[in-house]
Amino acid sequence: MISVTDLRPGTKVKMDGGLWECVEYQHQKLGRGGAKVVAKFKNLETGATVERTFNSGEKLEDIYVETRELQYLYPEGEEMVFMDLETYEQFAVPRSRVVGAEFFKEGMTALGDMYEGQPIKVTPPTVVELKVVDTPPGVRGDTVSGGSKPATLETGAVVQVPLFVEPGEVIKVDTRTGEYVGRA
C-alpha cells in the first residue's frame, strides 16, 4: 500500500479494478480542514484519464511493474506481436498499448512494462531511423523561411521533413513527437 501523499507522476497503482499511472499530482492544503491530494491518472489498459481527489490519509495499492526488452516481430490485425528477448516468449499487444505504434518496423527493439507476466505498455526508442518511401519534390521558391513537406516512411507514418529530403533517404524521427530530427 502507498499513501496518496507519496504519489508522483509515473507511480503505478491498482484502483477501481484497473491499473493506473499517475500523470499529474497536486497537494492542496486547506485552511481549517485537512490537506487534500488531487491526482490525474491514466488507465494503462484503455488509455482513459480520470482525476481523483483524496484525503491525505488515504492509501492505494501500488503495483510492481517490470521493464523488459522486447523485439517487434510482425503486425496481426489490430495487435502487434512482440518477443521477450530473455525468455523468447511472444505477446500480442493491442495497438492502443503501444506508444508510437506507427514508427515500429520489424526487428526493432523496445521497452515493455510488464505486470504479472503480461505487457501493459510498450515504448519505442526515443529516436528511430526510417527510410523515406515517398515525398513530393521540394520547390525552393515556395516558402519565405525554412519550409517543409510531408514524407511517407517505410512504416506508413507521415512526418513533416525539410525540402531537401528525397525518397530513399534514411532519416531520424523522434517517436515522442513524430518530428524529423535529422539525416541518419
From Swiss-Prot:
Gene Ontology MF term list: translation elongation factor activity
Keyword terms of this UniProt record: Cytoplasm, Elongation factor, Protein biosynthesis
Signal peptide annotation: none
Protein biosynthesis listed as a keyword: yes
Highest taxon of the lineage: Bacteria
Listed GO biological process terms: peptide biosynthetic process
Keyword Protein biosynthesis: yes
Annotated pathway: Protein biosynthesis; polypeptide chain elongation
Entries under InterPro entries matching the protein: Elong-fact-P_C, NA-bd_OB-fold, Rib_uL2_dom2, Transl_elong_fac_P/YeiP, Transl_elong_KOW-like, Transl_elong_P/YeiP_cen, Transl_elong_P/YeiP_CS, Transl_elongation_fac_P
Pfam families: EFP, EFP_N, Elong-fact-P_C
Subcellular location(s) per record: Cytoplasm
Primary residence: cytoplasm
Gene Ontology CC: one annotated term: cytoplasm
Record function comment: Involved in peptide bond synthesis. Stimulates efficient translation and peptide-bond synthesis on native or reconstituted 70S ribosomes in vitro. Probably functions indirectly by altering the affinity of the ribosome for aminoacyl-tRNA, thus increasing their reactivity as acceptors for peptidyl transferase.
NCBIfam families: efp, PRK00529.1
The family this protein is said to belong to: Belongs to the elongation factor P family.
Protein name: Elongation factor P
